[in-house]
């Protein structure tokens, strides 16, 4: 436990030193800013920087960043390597090292010497030969081509009026010289001011047929010589119209809503103009603002994409048709034209029918939904109101003052019994009750006579209220019998309740005999029970 404070103090003391180590990049060694290199040799420029965190380095030459596109330059972790230096490689080189705390720059000035005697110049530790000349540097080097990848194409064909550049980049020790020849004859005259824009490149512009031939570059120094030959063919332009090659365009079928394309190949001495046209069908001329006449038929010009040049000297163009519809079906032609004329070829496009079934007519639904909401709601409501009014009127007109007795149905006979006494005055199955309803007049009260009763009839006023019209209906009930009091005659049949009896009974009560047959006539109900 006693060692813990001491260990803690030791760790705390080490923290400042660790923080002090972190910082911007710093120089790890001295450099010689002035570097001298011989032509055609390899140069290495060091960038001795360090830091925590480790810095990232970037090289520039005369303010331009050196990247992988510079074929003879290679950026290494420890510096920059330049192979087979040329005179154009001379300049100011800067190595810039950067981390999260800052940056540091290391500057070099590179001088390229054409020929140097031993001991006359000391390129320094950063140079290609160190502090003193080695035996290899004192020897001569034969010339050699440094960019053979740019010399692979030795046969070049160009049309009249075009240009061509022939390259023969080489290096050697001492610095080699280059000489150009045509058909084994030395070129003594420059055809243009930019004929030799660079030392190792021959530029031929505005070619003419007489410029065709073999061009040879000869590179030599004291150690030897090398050469390379190019064959240039200047093609005389033939004055002819373009020719459509191959079988395209061809007839094509596409699904409804699908995508397809036509293609067209045109051979021409110069880059032609390729245009796609679509024939205007009969009756649809008014839908197009402008048309052209080809072969006696009218066509509309379609948008055309880029024209691609092919290695065989032909030109290619494609027409893309996306989301095909029935309107896209028809004849298409590819037209190739130049200053000498034009050629064309036609093809047909067929669009298959839409597999989806047609939907309901849109015009009918739009006209229905276009009505205002009050009209849509009010028309059915008004119809319901009118229908209800008509039904109510019909119900009112069906009500009659009193139906004739002869038209009422005759129910079955129910003999009098003791059930009448049990139910009291509420249920009178054996009473003969005739009801005659008349609207708007007060009739006689009801007379209910029990059999064998000598007391006067009980009076039960009946008042019906119509729930629809709120009018009061008075009913009169009369006791009917066929025989006299004490008679043993059978109950009178209901056939005696004819119109004459009813007309006589409605104003007053008449007794016909023993109350053995009960008949209840209701005007509103239209039945006899």
From Swiss-Prot:
Segments on the Extracellular side according to the record's topology features: 21-374
One Gene Ontology biological process: diaphragm development
Transmembrane domains' residue ranges: 375-395
Stretches assigned to the Cytoplasmic side: 396-529
Cystine crosslinks: 47-95, 168-217, 264-334
Signal peptide (UniProt feature, chain positions): 1-20
Gene3D superfamilies: Immunoglobulins
Pfam families: I-set (PF07679), Ig_3 (PF13927)
UniProt membrane topology term: Single-pass type I membrane protein
SMART domains, alphabetized: IG (SM00409), IGc2 (SM00408)
Glycosylation sites: 107, 227, 251, 289
Location(s), subcellular: Cell membrane; Golgi apparatus membrane; Cytoplasmic vesicle, Secretory vesicle membrane
UniProt-annotated stretches for the region Disordered: 117-152, 405-427
Keyword annotations: Cell membrane, Cytoplasmic vesicle, Disulfide bond, Glycoprotein, Golgi apparatus, Immunoglobulin domain, Membrane, Receptor, Repeat, Signal, Transmembrane, Transmembrane helix
Residues of the Ig-like C2-type domain: 25-111, 143-233, 242-350
GO cellular component: cell-cell contact zone; Golgi apparatus; Golgi membrane; plasma membrane; transport vesicle; transport vesicle membrane
Primary localization: membrane
Molecular-function GO term, any one: identical protein binding
Subunit text: Interacts with FGF2 with a low affinity.
Main function: Has a negative effect on cell proliferation.
Name this polypeptide is given: Fibroblast growth factor receptor-like 1
Organism: Rattus norvegicus (Rat)
Gene: Fgfrl1
């Amino acid at each position: 436990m006693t060692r813990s404070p001491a260990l803690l103090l030791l760790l705390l003391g080490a923290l400042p030193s660790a923080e002090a180590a972190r910082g911007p990049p710093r120089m790890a060694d001295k450099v010689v800013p002035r570097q001298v290199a011989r032509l055609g040799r390899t140069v290495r420029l060091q960038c001795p920087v360090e830091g925590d965190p480790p810095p990232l380095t970037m090289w520039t030459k005369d303010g331009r960043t050196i990247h992988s596109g510079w074929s003879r330059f290679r950026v290494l972790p420890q510096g920059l390597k330049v192979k087979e230096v040329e005179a154009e490689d001379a300049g100011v080189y800067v190595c810039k090292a950067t981390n999260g705390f800052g940056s540091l720059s290391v500057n070099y000035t590179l001088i390229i010497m054409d020929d140097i005697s031993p001991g006359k110049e000391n390129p320094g530790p950063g140079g290609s030969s160190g502090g003193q000349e080695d035996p290899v540097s004192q020897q001569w080097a034969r010339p050699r081509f440094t960019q053979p990848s740019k010399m692979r194409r030795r046969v070049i064909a160009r049309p009249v009026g075009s240009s061509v550049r022939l390259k023969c980049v080489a290096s050697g020790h001492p610095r080699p010289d280059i000489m150009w020849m045509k058909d084994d004859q030395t070129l003594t005259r420059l055809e243009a001011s930019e004929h030799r824009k660079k030392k190792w490149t021959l530029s031929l512009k505005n070619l003419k047929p007489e410029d065709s031939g073999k061009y040879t570059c000869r590179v030599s120094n004291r150690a030897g010589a090398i050469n390379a030959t190019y064959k240039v063919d200047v093609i005389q332009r033939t004055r002819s119209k373009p020719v459509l090659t191959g079988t395209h365009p061809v007839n094509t079928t596409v699904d409804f809503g699908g995508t397809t394309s036509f293609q067209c190949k045109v051979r021409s001495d110069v880059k032609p103009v390729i245009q796609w046209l679509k024939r205007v069908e009969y009756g649809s001329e008014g839908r197009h603002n402008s048309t052209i006449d080809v072969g006696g038929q009218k066509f509309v010009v379609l948008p055309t994409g880029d024209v691609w040049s092919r290695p065989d000297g032909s030109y290619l163009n494609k027409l893309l048709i996306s989301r095909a519809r029935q309107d896209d079906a028809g004849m298409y032609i590819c037209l190739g034209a130049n200053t000498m004329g034009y050629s064309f070829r036609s093809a047909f496009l067929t669009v298959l029918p839409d597999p989806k079934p047609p939907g309901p007519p849109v015009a009918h639904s739009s006209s229905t939904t276009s009505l205002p909401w009050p009209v849509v709601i009010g028309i059915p409501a008004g119809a319901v109101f009118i229908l209800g009014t008509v039904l109510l009127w019909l119900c009112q007109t069906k009500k009659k003052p009193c139906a004739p007795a002869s038209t009422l149905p005759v129910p079955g006979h129910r003999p009098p019994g003791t059930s009448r006494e049990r139910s009291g005055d509420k249920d009178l199955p054996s009473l003969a009750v005739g009801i005659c309803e008349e609207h708007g007049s007060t009739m006689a009260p009801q007379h209910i006579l029990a059999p064998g009763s000598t007391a006067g009839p009980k009076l039960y006023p009946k008042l019906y209220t119509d729930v629809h019209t709120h009018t009061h209906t008075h009913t009169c009930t009369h006791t009917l019998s066929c025989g006299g009091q004490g008679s043993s005659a059978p109950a009178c049949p209901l056939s005696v309740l004819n119109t004459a009896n009813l007309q006589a009974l409605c104003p007053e009560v008449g007794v016909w005999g023993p109350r053995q047959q009960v008949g209840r006539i209701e005007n509103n109900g239209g039945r006899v029970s």
